[in-house]
């Protein structure tokens, strides 16, 4: 009879703990749409055993099990999947920021909708073709002036819009860095709370771990991170190869604003000497962007690249070396190319209507200033003149 009831108790323990496990399943179902919630999984364990015979007499210890119990309720997370997910979401954020910038520039150029920017250049060219047939026709002359004024206005507006977008991205970088610092400080606080809850070894800080894991997932969007957890439940975070959260504190990023533009550069205060003006940047912007080398991770790095560190100018396109300084900086490249285009158009028009020539010998002007040989002056013989053949003064 005792053996019969013993078996019933074993079966009853299985049913009771299965019922408790169903409660955990119900909790999982109730939180399906809860942001940051991690599925909980029940792990069963053996109850105590009853020794039937002394092991010193027999080779094998004869024991009778008392049933099953719930050993622990754990997070159903995988370290490998966590690492991969955070890395790939960071990569997605990197290219999403670049795509957003490219799309915005495309909209400014109105390549798909509206009046294309290149149409303004074509219209000016067509106006010159018209005036070449009848140079003295005031209608054709006014058409050139109108199309030239339109090109100047659109170029100025486009360049200004690109500068404004740079400022907008600069503000986004500041907000992102502030958010990263907030996340890091909260992770450090959660580390301490989790340690206190789990110090006795009898309870898992489920809710706290859920929040911490969610913050780590979010942090992966902003940059390349490495996460390790010790036996006490404390999580260490490295960002861009530098310790960001450890057992002592969270090492917040700083922001250095450039003179003139106000463009921000994130740096590590703990490794920098601010008084001497020596800053260690968080993100390495030089070098090849490659998935193999994991240099294409994080939205902040992407925004730093597309924004650039200044406003693009035609001098940036003067040589291969100078272009290498802005290569990959989307907005600076577009600004520099725009400046080159407009400068070439203006230079070509000047060469036609008011060409220059160099003096073969030194001369003294009417105001008494002496100019050496080789000085560039207006080529009066080949420059444009009015209807009465007089020089045009603007």
Question: Language-model features: where?
Answer:
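Structural signature of extracellular appendage/secretion-system components
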Residues: 1-392
């Amino acid at each position: 009879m005792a053996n019969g009831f013993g078996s019933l108790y074993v079966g009853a323990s299985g049913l009771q703990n299965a019922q408790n496990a169903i409660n955990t399943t119900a909790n999982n179902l109730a939180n399906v749409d809860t942001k940051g919630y991690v599925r909980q999984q029940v792990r069963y364990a053996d109850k105590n055993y009853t020794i039937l015979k002394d092991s010193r007499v027999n080779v094998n210890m004869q024991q009778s099990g008392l049933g099953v119990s719930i050993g622990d309720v754990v997070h159903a997370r995988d370290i490998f999947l966590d690492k991969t997910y955070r890395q790939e979401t960071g990569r997605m954020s990197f290219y999403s920021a670049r795509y957003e910038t490219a799309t915005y520039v495309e909209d400014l150029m109105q390549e798909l909708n509206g009046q294309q920017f290149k149409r303004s250049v074509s219209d000016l060219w067509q106006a010159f073709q018209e005036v070449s047939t009848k140079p003295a026709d005031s209608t054709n002359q006014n058409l050139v002036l109108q199309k030239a004024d339109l090109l100047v206005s659109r170029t100025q507006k486009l360049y200004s819009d690109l500068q404004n977008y740079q400022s907008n991205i600069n503000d986004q970088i500041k907000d992102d860095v502030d958010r990263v610092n907030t996340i890091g400080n909260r992770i450090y606080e959660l580390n301490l709370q989790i340690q206190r809850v789990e110090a006795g070894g009898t309870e898992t800080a489920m809710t706290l771990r859920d929040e911490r894991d969610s913050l780590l997932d979010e942090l992966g969007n902003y940059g390349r991170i490495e996460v390790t957890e010790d036996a006490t439940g404390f999580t260490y975070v490295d960002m861009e190869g530098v310790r960001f959260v450890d057992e002592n504190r969270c090492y917040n990023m700083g922001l250095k604003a450039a003179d003139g533009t106000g463009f921000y550069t994130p740096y590590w205060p703990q490794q920098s000497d601010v008084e001497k003006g020596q800053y260690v940047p968080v993100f390495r912007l030089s070098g090849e962007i490659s998935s193999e080398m994991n240099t294409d991770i994080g939205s902040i790095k992407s925004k730093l690249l597309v924004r650039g560190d200044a406003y693009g100018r035609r001098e940036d396109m003067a040589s291969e070396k100078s272009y290498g300084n802005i290569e990959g900086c989307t907005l600076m490249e577009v600004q520099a190319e725009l400046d080159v285009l407009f400068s070439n158009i203006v230079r070509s028009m000047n060469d036609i209507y008011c060409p220059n020539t160099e003096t073969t010998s030194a001369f003294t002007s009417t105001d008494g200033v002496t100019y050496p040989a080789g000085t560039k002056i207006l080529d009066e013989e080949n420059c444009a003149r009015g209807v009465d053949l007089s020089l045009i003064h603007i």
